[in-house]
Amino acid sequence: MNAHNAALGGTPQRLKRGIPLALRGVARRFGEREVLKDIDLLVPAGQFVAIVGRSGCGKSTLLRLLAGLDQPSRGELLAGSAALAEAREDTRLMFQDSRLLPWKRVIDNVGLGLRGDWRAKALQALRAVGLAERANEWPAALSGGQKQRVALARALIHEPRLLLLDEPLGALDALTRIEMQQLIEGLWREHGFTVLLVTHDVSEAVAVADRVILIEDGEIGLDLPVELPRPRSRGSARLAALEAEVLNRVLAQPELPPQPEPVSPLPTQLRWAL
């Protein structure tokens, strides 16, 4: 079964707004170490893909390449038949750190970098993540989970077609993490954007994604479709079996030293507004 057909079981049955991605021979080298090794990957429009692997395997490096925060040493990154760089305005990125500006109120963080009459749109984005009533508060008054909801609203206001998630839930408690997973999944089903989620949490990957990709020492070691109906029952035997399959592969790999994060080509404020 090809990757496109494998996605159909979980991808929302509606007109896809997401960006289709194609990576062709993508590699990234830091000095003598090749972190990514000729990655070939096709992601259909509107698919939810989770990327897992041990620390240092290259998964966050891959996400930075897709976000345009770094450049490949070789290979092509495509959005459909065009260069992915041409779709930057349709791409948004969330980090583990919410990166809210503490001197700006919640609604102003959501509208960061926008011009014109954006406040109604920002309030709508906050309403979508359940925080409309906190619009005029300061970030310091919010919990960690609420700050990540604001970061998600900041991405949603741009109506992204590609949402890149770099372990955005890693610092949250277990219950808040599940609530955020359900929120992200619900918004994905509603809006149809393409999602790539980097996570250390295998159970999270299997619970929310159409497809789980394991990076092993810079290469795709496993590309596993998750063909389960939504919403998924976290206690199901099938979900547990898929989780065990991926986890056993992850644990069989050694942990590698982390890669240095390259200097972003984007101004700091624009990175935070991603």
From Swiss-Prot:
Topology with respect to the bilayer: Peripheral membrane protein
Keywords from the UniProt entry: ATP-binding, Cell inner membrane, Cell membrane, Membrane, Nucleotide-binding, Translocase, Transport
Enzyme Commission code(s) on record: 7.6.2.14
Subcellular location: Cell inner membrane
Domain ABC transporter: 21-242
MF terms (GO), sorted A to Z: ATP binding; ATP hydrolysis activity
Binding site for ATP: 53-60
InterPro entries: AAA+_ATPase, ABC_transporter-like_ATP-bd, ABC_transporter-like_CS, ABC_transporter_ATP-bind, P-loop_NTPase
Functional summary from the UniProt entry: Part of the ABC transporter complex SsuABC involved in aliphatic sulfonates import. Responsible for energy coupling to the transport system.
Family statement drawn from the similarity comment of this UniProt entry: Belongs to the ABC transporter superfamily. Aliphatic sulfonates importer (TC 3.A.1.17.2) family.
NCBIfam families: PRK11247.1
Subunit structure: The complex is composed of two ATP-binding proteins (SsuB), two transmembrane proteins (SsuC) and a solute-binding protein (SsuA).
The name this protein goes by in its record: Aliphatic sulfonates import ATP-binding protein SsuB 1
Organism: Pseudomonas aeruginosa (strain ATCC 15692 / DSM 22644 / CIP 104116 / JCM 14847 / LMG 12228 / 1C / PRS 101 / PAO1)
Lineage, top ranks: Bacteria, Pseudomonadati, Pseudomonadota, Gammaproteobacteria, Pseudomonadales
